[in-house]
Structure formats: C-alpha cells, structure tokens
Amino acid sequence: MKIKNIIIAILLILTIKSYSQEVNASVQVSARQIEGTDRDAFKELQQALYEFVNNRIWTNYNYKLEERIECTILLTLSERISSDQYKGKLNLVLRRPVYKTNYNTTMLNYIDKDVQFTYSEGEPLIYAENSFSNNLTSMIAYYVYVFLGLDADSFSKLGGTPYFEKAQSIVQNAQNTSEPGWKAFENMKNRYWLTENLLNPQYRPIRESIYEYHRKGLDLMYDNVENGRTNIAESLKLLQQSNRAKPGSFLMRLYLDSKRDEIIKIFGEGSPKTKTEVVNIMKEIDPANGDKYSAILRK
C-alpha cells in the first residue's frame, strides 16, 4: 500500500510540473527610490512574484521546455503612498524563439505606468480567476495572459483569442477598483484598451499580420531567406490595411515599438523594389519614425 501511495504521489508531482511550465519569466522588483524601507521585504515580494508567474498553472496545455514563454517583468517602485501602498511602473518584454536559430524576436516591449497596489511584508499573493481581490496579482496575471495570447497568435492564426479573453475578464472584474489602468475613460492607452484592441474585429488584420510575420516569415528565413522576407513584407500590408480602416490604435503602436528596429534590419538586405515598398508602408503607418525607415534605402 505504501508503494502504491508513493507512486501516486510521484505521478501527481509530475502532472503538476508538466502543467506549470508554460512561462519562463525573469521577475525583478526595484525599490531604490523608496527610502527607509526594509529591503528584505522587496526581495520577498520579488520571490513571491517569481513563483506566482512561473509556478502557476495558466493553461490546459503541456508545454515542452523549449516552448515555454520567455518574458521579463520588472516592477519598479517610485513612491510609497502609505505604509502598505505603492506606485510604480511595470516594464514588460515578451520574446519568441525563431525556428532553427538561436535568435529571439521581441513581440512586446512596453512600460505600464499605471501601477498602484497594496502590499504588506509577508502577505500572500492572492489571485482568483473569477473575481478581483488584489491589484498586483491581477495586473501580473493580465500580462501573463497577454503574453500567452501574443505567443499563440504568432504560431497559429488568431490562436491567442482564449488568452486575450482571460485578460479581458480580469479587466471586467477590475471595473470597481480605484487603482488606475483598468477603465476606458482614464486614457486610450491602458490595460482596458489593449484587450479591447486585441479582441476588436476591426484590428484583426494586426493579429493576422503577427502570424504571417512570425510563422511564415521569420520561421522560414533559415531555410529560405528571400521567401521569408517576402512573406514579412506581405504581413506589413495587413498592418497597412488595419491602419487605413482605423488609424492610431494602441495595439498598432505597441507592435511597431517592438518590431521597428527588426524590420529595418530585415529589409536592409532586400531588393530595391521591396525596400521601396516596405519603406512606403512603414512611413504611412508609423509616420513619426519615417526617417528611421529611410535608412533601409541607404543600405
């Protein structure tokens, strides 16, 4: 009987482990701007956040070691409002491996400045999927689902929808909280509008472009550089289509911020015709950075 119980316990551990490895996140908490505070408390918070992100079961899928979501979460605290209330920002970076290479492409590089939460030393990080109980864990869970969704979109057309819906559910549960970043009327570039854009059919071409750019473009370049580059150029036309229908979306800005330098590098080696075509598209959808794209023509 004891042997049977041991076997069952081992199987349970293996099952839990196999379902808890979706995310491989680097998590840091910086509190250098907060004076007169026990630094151990923030080290404890950093460890708790690390375990929350990396050990929690986020999906119903088994992820292989090489399939885990590579991301960075940096929480920088800038102000202590009261004994247990803090303000700060979240630096969020999502990376995706490119097929047959050691190269990781950046899919999201964003700073959320609407960060405010309550935390006491030793307090457990509580998160309930169907209710709002803690702003810090809700924000972190929100971005984990955004990470999962963007990653899924890059491997399967519109494959991230279930995860974006999870993130949107967190937004809905947060509508009665006083902390910023969750409501439509606060500004047009916050957590509310990010999931709104991701699930809005009008912006679907952006998500389709993510798939074409990564799965049919970058992932192909090891075997056939020209075909991969051509497919990436085609993916940019989907961005152009979305921008013409509804310009200035938050999602478009975030995506271009993560891809701008990479696009310039990729097409610096393209044909003159492709270079001109890409530069014209990018200047149209990202006019504030038009001079940067002109560098493609000089290469």
Segments and roles (model prediction):
Residues 1-23:
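Bacterial Sec-dependent N-terminal signal peptides
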Residues 21-87, 98-100:
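Start-of-domain marker
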Residues 28, 211-299:
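A cross-kingdom marker for long, charged
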Residues 32-39, 126-134, 244-245:
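Second-shell loop/turn segments in exported
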Residues 50-58, 149-153, 264, 268:
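Sec-exported extracytoplasmic/periplasmic mature domains
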Residues 159-252:
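Flexible, glycine-rich surface segments
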